[in-house]
Every structure is written in structure tokens, then in C-alpha cells.
Amino acid sequence: MLRNKSQKELLHLSRQLIQPLLPNFHKGQAGKIVVIGGNEDYTGAPFFASHSAALVGADLSHVICEKAAGPVIKSYSPDLMIHPYLMDLDNPHLNLNNSELEKLKNLPIDEIIKTNDNAVLNKLIDELILPKVTSLLNRIDIVVVGPGFGRDPLMLKSLIRIIEEVKVLNLPIILDADSLYLVSLSPKIIANYPKAIITPNVVEFQRIAKALSIDADLSESNKDKLIDQTIEVSRKLGDIIVFRKGEHDLIVKSSKFLINEITGSNKRVGGQGDTLTGAIATLVNWSNNYILRLWDNQVVVNWSNNYILRLWDNQVDLDQEDANLLACFAASSVVRNASSKAFNKYGRSMQTSNVHEYLHESFTELFGDSIFRTSNI
């Protein structure tokens, strides 16, 4: 039903996915998000993803990161919950002798991605990392993996094991950045998991397409060919959502697709993709709540101000696929609009932190500022 809708019509449809803020809702019902990533070298990526999720409207935004990254990310914002549960091979608490450590550091990637290989890495993960991570995952609505993960063997193996655990828990998962590198090496990591979304840029998409024996030229600009390539990648991965970032964002699930042509920023700066990923997490979670009809037919009574408000029923019945695709489109729209505003102010000096200044304004401009999304009766 989304096919051939105009950008304006898609934005209008997206409004019904925006979760209202009701007085009877409790903390966490508007989204419990976790971003898993971040190491000593890369602390900005997980921050931007989790901060974006919070600014767009998630109630609780967590980061699970490597221990050295924890204090740094905590210093960026007191609003995020930081859990330094991950470890890399430089962690002094691993109790490995020098020869073991050197052997692990020189492991070929092929051996790392084998599910049941390397008893030493698996033992470290089972004893020191996974119990804490799993404990938090049991309280989460949607998971983002990959931002700032790096290429450390223990970190990469932990990422694989965490993705497996997310699938066992049947949680929605968004794969970005370094997790897409793993997908390009072993597509089976996420293939056929219906709650997966991958968010490749041009280069990441080409790597994944090549791994699936699909021809994808970096210089390709023909819209129909880009759509066909992305549909083929989605299908070969088991009909998961592929959010292909580019001049125009292309959002595909099997044969269904949406294209976002809203003007963004001409400045390409590190971190914008992480901002998008966080926004996707919040809006996809709301779209899942929409499917659960979390706020349908609810009545809000405010005796002190003498009014009664009734929430609108869903005006158009969307199925799960369309709701998730539309949520991705809405997230893309918010971030593109915010990026355009930031670029108009800062020009060439624009940074991702400037984009975050405009996320709320962009959201309000596109979807309104009504807290309840209600009507008087």
C-alpha cells in the first residue's frame, strides 16, 4: 500500500507511528534502546547513535561498550546509561600469557567468524562478557550493533556471539558500521532473521553485494538498477530490511521499497550515519508498538483542566512490514531535515553534533508537536 505514495503522503502516513506521551504510560514504554559498540579509539559513534535515539524520543538509551571507552562516553552526556561490559585483547583482566595473547591478536578473520571455533575466545566471552550483556538485553526493546566496534579479535567474536543472543531473544536488531563488515565476510550471520535491518553506505553495500555474488558498481546512478540491486540483496539475505544510504535513501524489504528524496546536507562528516541508526531504532520500536496497538482507543481525562481527550484510532491499518519500512522512512526524513538545517547554519564547518541540535526541530516540523496526538470529544 506504500508503493507510489508521494513523499508528502508517506510523511502523513508516518504520523500515525509517532507514539503519543500518555499520562498512564510508564518509563520505558516509549523505547528502551541499546547501542552496542565503542572502544578506546572510537567513542563518538555509539554516543551519536544512542543520543539520537534519545533525542528523537526513546525513554531509555543505553550503550554497551569496551571498558576503556566507558568513562569517555559517560563524559559526553549524563542522560545516557553506559555499561562498559565489552573487552578487547589489551584488557589486563584477561589473565592470558604473552604467547596466548599474541596468537589471538594474529588470528585471521576467517577463524574469528567461525561459529564454534576458538575455545579460548569463546571461554572469555562466556565467562566475562556475555552474562552481563545478556542480563541487559533481557530488558531491551531494540538493539543497535556495530558503531565504533573496531577490528579487535575478541571484540569481533563478542559481536558475533551477541548477534546470536539477540536472535535467541527474538529482538529487533539494526546492524551498522563494523557489524556490516562481518556481514560482508559471512552473510549467514544475519540472513533469514526477519527482525534484522542493515544500514550500509555505498561501500558497505558493495562489499555485501559481492559476498552474495551480486554485481554492484560504486558509480551506478541509474535509479532502477539501484532498486533492483537492493531488492536482490534483501532477498538473498532472507527478505530482511536493507536501508541503503546514499544521495537518496533507499529502503527495501523483498520487493517492497521506499525512496527518500528529502534534501539533506552536502557535507559528509563522520557520525551522521550513527545519528540515522539511532533515529531508526526509536521509530522502528514505535512502529512495533503501533502494531501491538499500544495506544489505540485510549481516553485521557484531565479533571483539573476540565477536558476529555480521545486518542485517534489507527487511521490506516499498516501491516508489520509496511510499518517498519515507514518507520525507516520517517527516521531518514528527520535526520535529513536536521542535517539540512545544520548545514544551512554551519556550512563546511558542520559537524554531527550540530545535526543533533536540530533533531527536535526537524521532528516537530515534520510530525507536529502534539504530545497526545488527540482530538476533543
Swiss-Prot record:
Its EC number is 4.2.1.93. CDD domains: YXKO-related. One of its GO terms (biological process) is metabolite repair. The keyword Cell inner membrane does not apply. ATP binds at residues 245-249, 264-273. InterPro entries: Carbohydrate_kinase_pred_CS (IPR017953), CARKD (IPR000631), Ribokinase-like (IPR029056). Signal peptide: none annotated. Catalyzes the dehydration of the S-form of NAD(P)HX at the expense of ATP, which is converted to ADP. Together with NAD(P)HX epimerase, which catalyzes the epimerization of the S- and R-forms, the enzyme allows the repair of both epimers of NAD(P)HX, a damaged form of NAD(P)H that is a result of enzymatic or heat-dependent hydration. This is ATP-dependent (S)-NAD(P)H-hydrate dehydratase. It comes from Candida albicans (strain SC5314 / ATCC MYA-2876). The lineage of its organism: Eukaryota, Fungi, Dikarya, Ascomycota, Saccharomycotina.
